């Protein structure tokens, strides 16, 4: 945001910055350092182009002449443009030849800024600009800010290293930038508020400013999208007023579509007209961008599309009906289903579900859409076939609505008997697979196992998806009983089947089981590497598998937390929680729990318990049975109470919850918390020891330790050794305390389990120093190295000054893979630049 002012040491009127301007060195420094003759800032309205150009102008060297020509986006004729340019330069003549000669003969360094170049197609003016930019005077630098990319010979400039370009995405604010602007927000709320503003604005500069002027309603933590009259007014003036009525209508229709391409536009707006409308909107910088980095699909910039969808009447059901017809003709069943729902053609939507499989549940927000359709239309519409019953049942189980799922499963009886005995057995086997998962999630292990095994015995090759689900359920049960060998064998069988069917979604689901196995065995780094790889593969999918990516992010957050990487864990928990909330996944619980644990690590127990209350509130709002969340919620709460010195609260809660997992009607722990029962038991021993209300605490802990050691559960073993140390210290056995501590520390070092040690320190801040171990725990011996072996190779080559291409050639991997490794390195080390990554790695001692 700029205004004009007279500057005595520069020719003419020059811009000045807004009092609210935020200087961003990461954008300015590369622009000023670039030796390219032409700097092009091409981005939609409100992207901060003028402000960035102004900052660069104000930093021009003292021996440099700087000229500022504000064009206001007007569609000027060539003669008028030449006149204005000549006037700015102080030339007496404005004919083209004089301009070209004068610029070519400049003898002093000159920076010429063209701000807000012509917004509408103007081929004649673009050709003149191309001739001006072709002047090869090394003393002349062009700085061009524009919404529309002019039709100039950019490839030639690029090949000659004479072009430096900034696009809209690079101009966006990041969370740190926004935190600096939140001067009216309490510091403790700044990070969360900045994150919410980013989510709603995409970092778009005008959107961020409007959010700040609207008063940031997100400070209260509400996720509701507020209508912004200011944003709509801005769009009217800066976008719609520059377009024809036909283009305005087309843009508003497209804003209501999740994705579109030229062919769909032809269907919607007429043959020969639709593709032209789309091209014009793209050419004029109307916030049209690639849909999730796709080469084939486009979308309207999400924050603006969301604002338009909130406005009633800007697009009718008829447009969605026509879009549904096009997607159906293209056999794009996902797009057709979404458009049928938006058109409120519910019977059509149900008929399209015949083309859906279980894999569709892990795409986008299909679970939410299916559940809404089921609730809105009732059983008559959505339970018309065994396949529909299976889809709705799976969606209900995914969301944690077990009672409704049980009712839904019972509907399978309506489709019996089948015409043949074989079909009857297949239908029964599918029922058993679904019933097995319901029982498994309810904690009824034996009954679930029987159903899984009987279903596997009957399910045919065409029912491979149901077979995979049974194998996954059996894998999780093996993990819950600490039978790691059986779990590994079952998981391998399932992965082989998923790969044979070419199902990357199922492979990702099964790799989550594999990662749990690795975590249980004390190999969090291998688990993280496994999940990072599958995450990368899934992100290349055309339809974003949001629910699966959410679960993977939460598991990676847990792994990062266990290794002492709180910053990375926080990012994973945030992204995973966002995806799980969006897709109605009951696993959103673990996003809240993870955030609570990160807060407790920072001694912010008020925030930690707030996140636990948020978790409980969500579970209750969604009517999820308390067997899903009560045990782990109280276990984490008890961790915090013990750290606060409140063992009585911990003892009461743990005693109560342990009853559910002991006795004749005992339930298994939820599949996402494999070692929940053992953790509850050792925390209860700790609480009772502090209260001096325990008998034989060390014997009880040693029994748990023996079980963990026998089954290779190294992560749990480390926690138990540290718990034995604490209890031995409290009961006056220093020798045992010291030996248990040393055994625990060895596991912490070997398996990178820094969180277990952090929790001991939070419970007993002076214990390590009293036992003489604090001095030995230097950062070099305990600091977690989050990088995989391949990432260390890449970082070492970066430290040697190699380019990405050179690294790819030396390691025999693709350039894309090198860039992916570099992004992961930056994320894990919490840095933005290569030099920062190298410096931090050297400080950690992982790179020489």
Where are these regions (language model features)?
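Conserved P-loop NTPase "ATPase switch" module shared by AAA+ and STAND
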Residues: 103-125
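A structural signal for repeat-array scaffolds
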Residues: 242, 289-387, 399, 408-411, ...
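C-terminal boundary/linker of central alpha/beta nucleotide-binding cores
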Residues: 54, 147-148, 232-310, 318
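Recognition helix of helix-turn-helix DNA-binding domains
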Residues: 801-836, 840
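Amphipathic alpha-helical "lid/sensor" segments that cap RecA-like P-loop NTPase cores
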Residues: 53, 149, 165, 183-233, ...
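P-loop NTPase Walker A phosphate-binding motif
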Residues: 39-66
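Alpha-solenoid helical repeat architecture
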Residues: 294, 332, 345-350, 384-389, ...
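Amphipathic alpha-helical segments of tetratricopeptide repeats
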Residues: 337, 357-358, 375-378, 410-420, ...
